Each structure stands twice: as C-alpha cells, then as structure tokens.
C-alpha cells in the first residue's frame, strides 16, 4: 500500500491518469461564488413541490465527490475482488467552508465490496453502501430512478443477452427517517432496435416498523437510444403505489394503497456538430394523495451550447416548472441563464468548465406563498416581496474517471 500511495501521489502531481496497482480514482466537483441583485449571497430558484430545479447558474453550494476503488484480488480466470469508497463534501454559499454544522457536511455515501466470478456470467456479488443503478437528468440534476442504499445484491448476471440484477436494501439515503426492507429487481439490455434497448425495474417495499406503515411497490421502464443526433435519447415511464411513490426510491412508509404517483420523462441529448450540442427535458408527474393533497408537476427545459473556438463556449438554459395543487392553486417558476464558458473542449459534455453566468427568474404569488421562509421565492427572501430576481456568479465544474 505504501508503494501505491507513492505512485498515486506521483500521478496526481504529474497530471497522469490515476491508476496504479489496481487503484482507480474518480470524482466530481463544482464550486464558485454567486451574488443576488440586492448585493447579498446568491439565492437559488426552485419551485415548491417540484423535485428538481434547472441548475445552470442556479446552484448555491460547493460540492465534491471523491471516489477510490482498489482491486484486492485479480485472478487469471477473471475472478476479481474490489473495494470501493466515496467521500462527499458539501458547503452552502455564504458560509465558511468547514463542511460541518448547519450549512455543510462531510459524508461517506459509498463503502462497498464486489466479487466478480466467471460463474456469474459477467455479473458480480456486492455488499455495503453504494450508488446503485442511478438514472439522472443532467440539466436539472434529477435522479428520477435511484434505488441506491445499504444492502447487498447480484448485479448484471447475463442470461440470453439480458442482464438480471437483484438488490436488497434497508436505507435509501441519510435523510430517510424511517427504515423498511426494499427489494429491487432489474432486467436490462432488452434490445428493441439498432442502438436502442429497454430496462425494467420493479421495487417492492415491505411494511416498515413504524406506526400505520404499509407495503408498496413501483415499476420503472426506460428506453435508451444511443447515437441519437450524436448523443442519446431517454423515454421513461414510472408508477408507484404506497411507499412506492418514491418512484425508484422509498417513499412515505405511512402511504397506503390509495396513495399513488406516476411520471413520464422525455430527454434527448445531442451533439449535432463538434461545436453545437444541448439537452432537453419534458416531464410530467401526477401525485394522488389523501385529504385533497393531489398535485401535478409539469416541467420543460433546454440547455444549449455553441463553441466559438476550441476552448470558448456560450451556454444558455431556459427552464419552466409548474405545480398544480388542490389546496393553493397553480405555482409557476421560469428561469433563464446565459453563461460564457471556458472549457477543455467544444463538446456539450466536455469538462472541466469555468463559467461566468447571469440568471433571471420570475414566479407567481402562489409560488411565493408556498415557498419556505427565507428562500429565494418567499416574501422574506433575498428579493423581498418581488416576483422576480436575478443572480450573477462564476462557477467551475469538473468530473473525471468513472
């Protein structure tokens, strides 16, 4: 291990790919500074009731994930034992970067081990806490299908061209107040057309050990088309009942079978030329709740980038969210961001990037009334009683490995 540490340090200093003695290093990081039009710290725009926000020029934290994996054993027959761990760091804008307390944290979101054996047909056995088969939309950081957690399973066993997976987990995330056993079944690589394949996921949540708990389930189906306009396209349908309303995660354990949610997503990402790329999202989610708590979320947004040179891009993003509720009418939020950007390459997904940005947003009274006190949309937030506001700032974003 001492030799490995020396090699790792040398490669970091030399800017070389970080793999040595079976060790791999990957990660993600973003950080910067932002201010609001009134002179205070940047305050970010998210519609109450919407599970995500369009994030270009609309992120209010320093955040990093640092992941390392070490091959503990590699046999000539393909047997491989691997240990994987990740540290995440979070700190809100406007506060000292201590990564502790009310405005920051340091966590260990992943620590797990996997064993790959020839008999598993390309699959592996695993146990621990990990990110598991996560699906997300990049432009609003929406993890619409995320059965991650602490548990064990069999991943990607190949059978007749398909991949079969099973996972048992007890906890989705650190914020989950109550625990319940969750079983996730996944079938992938169901080829439908050249470059296109289906993936099915069924989640079953057992009745939790809390008062008035219920069991529930969810079903997710995704069609992914590769090489679509130089990128890819995703079409997703999800449905959940009871605690399955988490739609890929665990929802409220007290939700009964009359509580339901469904969601539809369409999201193409393109790179039409080496200079012009982008991503679009159209989403619809319906939540049926007891006691007049039904709501419907509509979302549409697009981010586009055009590279004027090898290292300079102009990036723009427009997003609109609407939440219709029975209790307090329809909430609306629209935002626009323009961001001159320096990058290592002209592609839409090329990173690192350094961006200057200007973001403008508008919302209605219903959104203001529903907003948490002190948040951007509230009457006690950075923009007072106004129904619009703007931010400026600079941000760096990068990812590597993985």
Model-derived features with residue positions:
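Gram-negative bacterial Sec-dependent N-terminal signal peptides
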Residues: 1-21
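Detector for outer-membrane/organellar transmembrane beta-barrel domains
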Residues: 192-207, 212-326, 331-336, 342, ...
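Surface-exposed coil loops of outer-membrane beta-barrel proteins
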Residues: 32-56, 95-109, 119-211, 373-385
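Transmembrane beta-strands of outer-membrane beta-barrel pores
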Residues: 31-37, 72, 87-93, 129-133, ...
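Transmembrane beta-strands of outer-membrane beta-barrel proteins
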Residues: 23-29, 74, 79-87, 123-127, ...
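Transmembrane beta-barrel architecture of outer-membrane proteins
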Residues: 59-65, 107-110, 147-151, 180-184, ...
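Beta-barrel outer-membrane channel/assembly domains of diderm bacteria
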Residues: 16-121, 269, 303-312, 316, ...
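Residues on the lipid-exposed face of transmembrane beta-strands in outer-membrane beta-barrel proteins
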Residues: 64-70, 110-115, 152-156, 185-190, ...
């Amino acid at each position: 291990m001492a030799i490995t540490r020396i090699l790792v340090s040398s490669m970091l200093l030399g800017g070389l790919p970080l793999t040595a003695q079976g060790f791999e290093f990957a990660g993600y990081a973003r950080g910067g500074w932002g201010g609001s039009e009134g002179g205070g710290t940047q305050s970010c725009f998210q519609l109450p009731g919407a599970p995500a926000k369009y994030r270009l020029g609309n992120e209010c934290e320093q955040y990093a994930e640092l992941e390392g994996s070490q091959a503990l054993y590699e046999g000539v027959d393909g047997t491989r034992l691997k240990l994987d761990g990740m540290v995440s760091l979070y700190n809100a804008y406007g506060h000292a970067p201590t990564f502790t307390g009310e405005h920051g944290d340091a966590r260990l979101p992943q620590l797990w081990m996997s064993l790959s054996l020839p008999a598993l047909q390309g699959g592996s056995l695993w146990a621990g806490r990990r990110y598991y088969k996560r699906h997300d939309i990049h432009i609003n950081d929406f993890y619409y299908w995320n059965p991650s957690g602490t548990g064990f399973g069999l991943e990607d066993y190949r059978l007749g061209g398909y991949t079969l997976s099973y996972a048992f987990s007890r906890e989705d995330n650190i914020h989950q107040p109550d625990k319940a056993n969750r079983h996730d079944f996944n079938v992938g690589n169901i080829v439908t057309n050249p470059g296109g394949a289906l993936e099915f996921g069924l989640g079953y949540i057992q009745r939790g050990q809390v008062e008035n708990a219920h069991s529930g389930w969810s079903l997710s189906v995704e069609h992914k088309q590769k090489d679509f306009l130089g990128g890819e396209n995703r079409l997703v349908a999800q449905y959940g009942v009871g605690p399955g309303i988490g739609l890929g995660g665990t929802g409220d354990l007290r939700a009964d079978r009359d509580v339901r949610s469904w969601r539809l997503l369409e999201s193409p990402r393109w790179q039409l030329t080496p200079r012009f790329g982008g991503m679009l999202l159209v989403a619809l989610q319906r939540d049926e709740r007891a006691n007049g708590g039904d709501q419907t979320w509509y979302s549409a947004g697009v981010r586009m980038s055009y590279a004027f040179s090898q290292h300079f891009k102009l990036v723009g993003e427009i997003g609109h969210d609407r939440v219709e509720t029975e209790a307090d009418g329809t909430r609306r939020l629209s935002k626009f961001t323009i961001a001159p950007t320096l990058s290592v390459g002209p592609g839409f997904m090329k990173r690192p990037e350094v961006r200057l940005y200007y973001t403008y947003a508008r919302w209605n009274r219903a959104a203001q009334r529903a907003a948490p006190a002190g948040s951007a949309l509230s009457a006690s937030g950075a923009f007072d009683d106004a129904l619009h506001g703007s931010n400026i700032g600079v941000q760096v974003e990068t990812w590597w490995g993985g």
